[in-house]
């Protein structure tokens, strides 16, 4: 009996992997679009002070925390898949050149690439942790 239990435990992955579905992840995608495209638009309309606040507060602090939190919640509820972190990074990548003003085009392009990679890493790690937590809670 104990050998059968060991075999069944080996077949189950540590991190449950699921298929990506737009229907199940639409709330996360809509929240990300609001966070990365609508909220920055309000700060851009506020003038120079709003843009400075947007650059310092949103780009470096609030956006990575939002990405990590939404990835964690998604991982707990849906499990892990590779497509969700990629969608989060793509949605964020589009907003950086649109709302964040930089002095030179090269600086803007480099910041866009770096922040896209950072957001993808945050989302990937949070989704993996969320899926692991999901697995622990179901045991």
What is each residue range found by the language model?
Residues 96-118:
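Membrane-helix boundary connector in multi-pass membrane proteins
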Residues 33-42, 89-100:
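Aromatic-anchored segments of alpha-helical transmembrane domains
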Residues 1-24:
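N-terminal juxtamembrane cytosolic/stromal segments of multi-pass membrane proteins
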Residues 81-90:
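Cytoplasmic-side transmembrane-helix entry/capping segments in multi-pass membrane proteins
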Residues 22-31, 121-139:
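Membrane-water interface at the C-terminal end of transmembrane alpha helices
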Residues 62-81:
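Canonical alpha-helical transmembrane segments
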Residues 53-67, 112-124:
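Alpha-helical transmembrane segments of polytopic membrane proteins
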Residues 21-54:
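Membrane-helix boundary elements
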């Amino acid at each position: 009996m104990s050998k059968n239990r060991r075999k069944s435990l080996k077949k189950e992955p540590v991190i449950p992997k699921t298929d990506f579905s737009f229907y199940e992840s639409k709330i996360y995608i809509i929240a990300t679009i609001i966070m990365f495209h609508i909220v920055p638009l309000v700060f851009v309309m506020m003038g120079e002070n709003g843009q400075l606040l947007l650059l310092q507060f949103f780009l470096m602090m609030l956006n990575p925390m939002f990405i990590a939190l939404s990835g964690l919640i998604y991982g707990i509820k849906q499990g892990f898949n590779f497509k969700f972190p990629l969608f989060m990074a793509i949605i964020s990548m589009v907003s950086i050149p649109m709302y964040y003003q930089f002095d030179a085009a090269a600086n803007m392009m480099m910041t866009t690439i770096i922040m896209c990679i950072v957001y993808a890493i945050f989302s990937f790690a949070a989704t993996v942790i969320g899926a692991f937590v999901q697995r622990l809670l179901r045991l």
